[in-house]
């Protein structure tokens, strides 16, 4: 599996703000928005482009555009925080949705929503979720995408844990990973250590319903 860890001073500074327990919801969202855009930028590096003629106020020039913009697929709830930065970088991208909640006892994903194109063959997919912990949710989502024909899937995560990275690598699924960091492990509740806490709660406040 191809893994890209984005090593950049601005990435590190935003990651620090996300980790800091003093960052309130607004500060966390702002840092996540910045970091999300940086990760999308890096993930887009190898997308196919096409060239065309464009006219400047002075002369003709060669223009460049994406040949096929990716579909952005957030894993709800926390992945919603990565839609705006993704669309700011790729405004003509489509957006799909996968809803997964975590069972706090088993730590397994519980699906509750799937809104995706029926056919994803020959379509680049950016699967976005701030956290890659055990890998359970991401693997469930990747299998849904693969079942619809996706073979070009990029998982974009702000913080990844080594056990989740290992699970992805061992799955044999068609995925590459772009992340800001790989943390060493998980605690007894399957939270990333040192991590940044519950990304969904820190983006939007505590969830007050059970799914």
Curated annotation (Swiss-Prot):
Domain of life: Bacteria
Chain positions recorded as uracil binding sites: 192, 197-199
Cofactor, free-text remark: Binds 1 Mg(2+) ion per subunit. The magnesium is bound as Mg-PRPP.
Co-factor(s): Mg(2+)
Record InterPro entries: PRibTrfase_dom, PRTase-like, Upp_B, UPRTase/APRTase, Ura_phspho_trans
GO molecular function: GTP binding; magnesium ion binding; uracil phosphoribosyltransferase activity
Keyword Transferase: yes
Any one Pfam family match given in the protein's UniProt record, by short name: UPRTase
Regulation: Allosterically activated by GTP.
GO biological process: UMP salvage; uracil salvage
Keywords: Allosteric enzyme, Glycosyltransferase, GTP-binding, Magnesium, Nucleotide-binding, Transferase
Keyword tRNA processing annotated: no
Binding site for 5-phospho-alpha-D-ribose 1-diphosphate: 77, 102, 129-137, 198
Pathway: Pyrimidine metabolism; UMP biosynthesis via salvage pathway; UMP from uracil: step 1/1
EC number: 2.4.2.9
Catalysed reactions listed for this entry: UMP + diphosphate = 5-phospho-alpha-D-ribose 1-diphosphate + uracil
Annotated TM spans: none
Stored CDD domains: PRTases_typeI
HAMAP family: Upp_B (MF_01218_B)
Family: Belongs to the UPRTase family.
Functional summary from the UniProt entry: Catalyzes the conversion of uracil and 5-phospho-alpha-D-ribose 1-diphosphate (PRPP) to UMP and diphosphate.
Record-given protein name: Uracil phosphoribosyltransferase
Species name: Corynebacterium glutamicum (strain ATCC 13032 / DSM 20300 / JCM 1318 / BCRC 11384 / CCUG 27702 / LMG 3730 / NBRC 12168 / NCIMB 10025 / NRRL B-2784 / 534)
Gene name of the record: upp
């Amino acid at each position: 599996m191809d893994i890209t860890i984005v090593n950049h001073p601005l990435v590190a500074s935003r990651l620090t703000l996300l980790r800091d327990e003093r960052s309130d919801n607004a500060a966390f969202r702002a840092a996540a928005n910045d970091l999300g855009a940086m990760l999308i930028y890096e993930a887009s590096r190898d997308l196919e482009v096409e060239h065309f003629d464009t006219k400047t106020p002075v002369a003709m020039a060669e223009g460049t555009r994406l040949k096929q913009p990716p579909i952005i697929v957030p894993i709800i709830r926390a992945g919603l925080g990565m839609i705006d930065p993704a669309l700011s970088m790729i405004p003509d991208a489509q957006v799909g949705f996968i809803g997964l909640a975590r069972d706090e006892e088993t730590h397994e994903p519980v699906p509750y929503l799937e809104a995706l194109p029926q056919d994803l063959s020959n379509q680049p997919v950016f699967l976005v979720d701030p956290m890659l912990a055990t890998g359970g949710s991401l693997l469930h989502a990747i299998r849904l995408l693969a079942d619809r024909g996706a073979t070009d899937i990029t998982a974009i995560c702000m913080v990844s844990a080594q056990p989740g990275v290992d699970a992805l690598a061992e799955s044999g699924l068609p995925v590459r990973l772009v992340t800001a960091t790989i943390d060493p492990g998980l605690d007894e509740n399957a939270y990333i250590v040192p991590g940044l806490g519950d990304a969904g709660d820190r983006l939007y406040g505590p969830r007050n319903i059970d799914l």
